[in-house]
Amino acid sequence: MVLVDRSDGLTGILHAVQVTYQKKQTRDTLRIRDHQAASKEALFPLYFMKTDAVETLIEKLLPLCTVVTPNIPEAEVLSGLKIKTVEDMEKAAQTIHERYHCAVLVKGGHFINDANDLLCADGRMTWFHGTRIDNPNTHGTGCTLSSAIASFLARGLDLNESIRHAKKYLSGALSSMLDLGKGAGPMDHGYTLAKDMNRN
């Protein structure tokens, strides 16, 4: 979950019911007092969550979100539909959007040949096309994307532009090919800093 009110951000996995209720209470006390009139939310993983926590999250938090960002398996849980094709992604996105009354960005990274994501917002479908980057170090891609979207929303960009900028940032972090430790390591979140240093 990523909560952004103005320049503040809070990230973390909501693994239990008690944490989810605390998050909702915190969210209810934080309101933007400018033209936005509501908090910016980008919601991610159902992984590692207990079943009752998933149910509570769906009931209490999804209706408060500006956008939820499930991957394919998570979108299947939220929609109750199997996703095997692009058409399935569209049906699932529409179902989640109508059921929880929030925008939904279904991430297509679990498909083999591309990294195309589908946004359903205000009853409209928008595809964000991307190129799959052959990098084994993909730990935290979903968290990075949702955090980046929330950050750009907090800077005043609209949802579509926030997603475009977030996907560009994520692609850059993957393309940098940082290789730390063993297994599926992290991406290079500071790749833009390295570019600036090299220019200087």
Where is each model-derived feature located?
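Short, charged, surface-exposed loops that flank catalytic or proteolytic processing sites
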Residues: K82-M89, A154-R164
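Glycine-rich beta-alpha junction loops
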Residues: E74, G109-I112, R132-D134, K167-L170
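Acidic, small/polar-enriched beta strand-loop surface segments
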Residues: M1-S39
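Glycine/charged-rich beta-loop-alpha catalytic/anionic-binding loops adjacent to active sites
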Residues: G123-D134
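Conserved phosphate/ATP/ADP-binding segment of small-molecule kinases
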Residues: F48-M125
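Charged C-terminal helix
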Residues: N160-N200
